[in-house]
């Protein structure tokens, strides 16, 4: 039910003071003036509160239960982050304020930038991108500017592995590049022979995630970096899986030239589902001049914004409207410290491998052996045996109060789950997940129709995904 459906004529939730201004005129063009009142819902304050409180109770989140969504790092977000972000000194400031009145905010962003550079092994960083994919596009635009600045106009291609995030080829195409996909080797990693076949002087960038989306560390990364640089290409790091290597190694040490981060993954800020988010981009020295404006700089003991960067790719958004997300990430890093971040990465890998062994007794692991922070399993055998698909198992997990893992991704594994437990989950939680998964597999063999009909206990049962994609409804249809 939408809020429009509980609207009643004459109900009021807020009252404006009387307008004492008698003579005024609205200096707007005629075509911008409304011809009728907006059709806002007429509801009381208690109606609004109850409506949205009831809706929120139907949500599932990391504060409710286990959320093993692979490649998403759904770790628990410590509440101290929220406490600090709610300080009035942070929450009540405005982008239009004079710089001298927001020195604390500018210092926080400057220090966050410096910390992220240290963590990733980059030389400079921008905090402007408002999400991971936005950062990804920013990084690709920087690479384009770099090649064009050298008069190198023949570089029109970006290489991505077949296990890459879908945003990688999308960002490359949006920036005007052709995308070359290379097949993974039998071990799930980049096949150097396949890479060598397509790597030439027309390639601008190689985009990689390390560990990759199969949860495997690209052990040949130094060789890949050398191959890229020998051909004049840049090496781009998708930071989706940075959590696994915190304190152990850094993208910059592996030979990457550009990094984008997802603060909502590694650095414990909320998954905004559309915003606000934050996708900082780090670069090596030779690319720093291309970073977007404005850049946060420190001049003596003062902080300000610098717009004077002639070779910058320019503006990629207007304001730091997602500042509170940066406050949360800053708080998390400061709270954890170097040792704490390293421990988090170690525990993420330990939890993933513990759960991998548990799950391997129930379903096949796509690429057996030690994984990093996540692993990919497949129920293809069960599907052939019973007709129960990964989607059915995912829906049945919801009945047991557990969010389903990522499914059907990467695309190179069939009927698969990508499972990432993160470091914040206990052994008890992992054991419980494995027990429930085993129970569902037994249900699938004994009563497949039961699993195919799931979920049964959720506020909304199976959605019509096809209709939602092809015939989306974006607005309420009023009855005339």
Swiss-Prot record:
GO biological process, one term: glycine decarboxylation via glycine cleavage system
Domain of life: Bacteria
Molecular function (Gene Ontology), one example: pyridoxal phosphate binding
Reactions catalysed according to its record: N(6)-[(R)-lipoyl]-L-lysyl-[glycine-cleavage complex H protein] + glycine + H(+) = N(6)-[(R)-S(8)-aminomethyldihydrolipoyl]-L-lysyl-[glycine-cleavage complex H protein] + CO2
Keyword set, alphabetical order: Oxidoreductase, Pyridoxal phosphate
Gene Ontology cellular-component annotations: cytosol; glycine cleavage complex
PTM-bearing positions, type N6-(pyridoxal phosphate)lysine: 265
EC number: 1.4.4.2
Family according to the record: Belongs to the GcvP family. C-terminal subunit subfamily.
Classification via NCBIfam families: PRK04366.1
Function of the protein: The glycine cleavage system catalyzes the degradation of glycine. The P protein binds the alpha-amino group of glycine through its pyridoxal phosphate cofactor; CO(2) is released and the remaining methylamine moiety is then transferred to the lipoamide cofactor of the H protein.
Self-association state and partner proteins as the record states: The glycine cleavage system is composed of four proteins: P, T, L and H. In this organism, the P 'protein' is a heterodimer of two subunits.
Protein name: Probable glycine dehydrogenase (decarboxylating) subunit 2
């Amino acid at each position: 039910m939408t809020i429009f459906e509980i609207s009643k004529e004459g109900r009021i939730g807020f009252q404006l003071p009387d307008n004492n201004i008698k003579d005024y005129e609205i200096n707007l063009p005629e075509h911008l003036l409304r011809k009728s009142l907006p059709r806002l819902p007429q509801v009381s304050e208690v109606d609004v509160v109850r409506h949205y409180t009831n809706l929120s109770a139907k949500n599932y989140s990391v504060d409710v239960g286990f959320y093993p969504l692979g490649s998403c790092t759904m770790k628990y977000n410590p509440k101290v982050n929220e406490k600090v972000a709610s300080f009035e000194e942070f929450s009540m400031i405005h982008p239009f304020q004079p710089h001298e009145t927001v020195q604390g905010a500018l210092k926080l962003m400057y220090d966050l930038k410096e910390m992220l550079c240290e963590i990733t092994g980059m030389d400079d960083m921008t905090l402007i991108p408002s999400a991971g994919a936005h950062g990804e596009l920013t990084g690709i635009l920087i690479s384009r500017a770099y090649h064009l600045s050298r008069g190198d106009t023949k570089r029109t291609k970006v290489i991505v592995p077949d296990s890459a995030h879908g945003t990688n080829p999308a960002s490359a195409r949006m920036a005007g590049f052709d995308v070359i996909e290379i097949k993974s080797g039998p071990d799930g990693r980049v096949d150097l022979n396949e890479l060598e076949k397509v790597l030439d002087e027309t390639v601008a960038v190689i985009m990689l995630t390390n560990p990759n989306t199969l949860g495997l560390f690209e052990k040949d990364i130094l060789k890949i970096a050398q191959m890229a640089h020998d051909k004049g290409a840049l090496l781009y790091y998708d930071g989706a899986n940075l959590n696994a290597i915190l304190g152990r190694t850094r993208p910059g040490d592996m030979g990457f030239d550009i990094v984008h981060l997802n603060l909502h993954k590694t650095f414990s800020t909320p998954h905004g589902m559309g915003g606000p988010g934050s996708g900082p981009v780090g670069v090596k020295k030779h690319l720093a001049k291309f970073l977007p404006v404005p850049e946060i700089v420190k001049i003596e003991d003062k902080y300000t914004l610098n717009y004077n960067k002639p070779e910058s790719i320019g503006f990629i958004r207007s304001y730091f409207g997602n500042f509170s997300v940066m406050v949360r990430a800053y708080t998390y890093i400061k709270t954890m410290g170097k040792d704490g971040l390293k421990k988090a990465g170690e525990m993420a890998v330990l939890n993933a491998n513990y759960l991998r062994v548990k799950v391997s007794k129930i379903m096949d692991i796509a690429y057996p052996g030690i994984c990093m922070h996540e692993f990919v399993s497949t129920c293809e055998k069960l599907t052939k045996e019973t007709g129960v698909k990964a989607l059915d198992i995912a829906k049945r997990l919801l009945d047991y109060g557990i969010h389903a893992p990522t499914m059907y991704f990467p695309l190179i594994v069939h009927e698969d789950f990508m499972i990432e437990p993160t470091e914040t989950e206990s052994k008890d939680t992992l054991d419980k997940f494995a027990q429930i998964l085993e129970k569902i597999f037994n249900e699938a063999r004994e009563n497949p129709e039961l699993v195919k009909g799931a979920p049964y206990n959720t506020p909304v049962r199976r959605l019509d995904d096809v209709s939602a994609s092809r015939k989306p409804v974006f607005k309420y249809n009023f009855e005339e």
